């Protein structure tokens, strides 16, 4: 998940927001409290100048949410061929088999085959569009975000192939859709063990009483 976060930060965050995810949630990825604070400070968030009261920017804090890359939809559309990049917080929940969909989409860019164009001329990408075999209508406004192996350098030494980066960021975006899932799973086993123990104890007590 930390690898996927790095791909999001260095590649995806230039266009896509995570407006429902707080920077403090990075602690769920295995970062310490100090690391979360330091990582939050690498993000620039909107702020208010305490001296003038005017809008400004400041380093992020754990209590902040991931900042948006554009101030509004007009600016977002102007920078992206009139297409507004979607927020990615819940993207894997918004698609069937969302994790695999995201990973496939990121690796599905390729020129349309001659056979496809012969049968479906409308499949040719128009100006500002890119052919992707996994996109519903085969052409989308998003340029290939993962363009070369090694585009991101992983801290753990994992080779950052396009396929690996796609898999990692898809896993990260699955986490952003439910950032407390890891903690709930970790809590689940002790709870189940306690319930099982309590059930056995209750059964044993009943047999002794009756």
Language-model features and meaning:
Residues 17-90:
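His/Cys-centered metal/cofactor-coordination and adjacent catalytic loops
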Residues 86-127:
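Acidic, glycine-rich loop-and-strand cores that form catalytic or ligand-binding grooves
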Residues 1-18, 189-194, 198:
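Sequence/structural segment immediately N-terminal to covalent heme-attachment motifs in c-type
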Residues 1-6, 17-31, 35-36, 157, ...:
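Electrostatic cytochrome c docking/interface patches
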Residues 184-210:
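Juxtamembrane interface at the cytosolic side of transmembrane helices
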Residues 6-18, 67-71, 84-93, 101-104, ...:
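C-type cytochrome heme c attachment motif
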Residues 134-136, 142-178:
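Extended, hydrophilic extramembrane loops/domains of integral membrane proteins
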Residues 1, 5, 81, 95, ...:
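Solvent-exposed, acidic/flexible segments
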């Amino acid at each position: 998940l930390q690898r996927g976060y790095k791909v999001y930060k260095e590649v995806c965050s230039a266009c896509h927001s995570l407006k429902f995810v707080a920077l403090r949630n990075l602690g769920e990825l295995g970062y310490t409290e100090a690391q979360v604070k330091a990582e939050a400070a690498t993000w620039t968030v909107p702020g208010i100048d305490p001296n003038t009261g005017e809008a400004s920017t400041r380093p992020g804090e754990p209590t902040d949410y991931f900042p948006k890359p554009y101030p509004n939809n007009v600016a977002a559309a102007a920078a992206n061929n009139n297409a507004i990049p979607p927020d990615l917080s819940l993207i894997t929940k918004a698609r069937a088999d969302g994790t695999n969909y995201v990973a496939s989409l990121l690796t599905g860019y390729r020129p349309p085959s001659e056979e496809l164009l012969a049968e479906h001329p409308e499949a040719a990408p128009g100006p500002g569009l890119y052919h992707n075999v996994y996109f519903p209508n085969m052409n989308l406004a998003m340029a290939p975000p993962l363009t070369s192996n090694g585009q991101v350098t992983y801290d753990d030494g994992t080779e950052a192939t396009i396929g690996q980066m796609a898999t990692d960021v898809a896993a990260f975006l699955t986490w952003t859709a439910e950032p407390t899932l890891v903690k709930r799973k970790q809590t689940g086993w002790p709870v189940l063990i306690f319930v099982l123990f309590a059930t056995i104890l209750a059964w044993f007590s009943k047999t002794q009483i009756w």
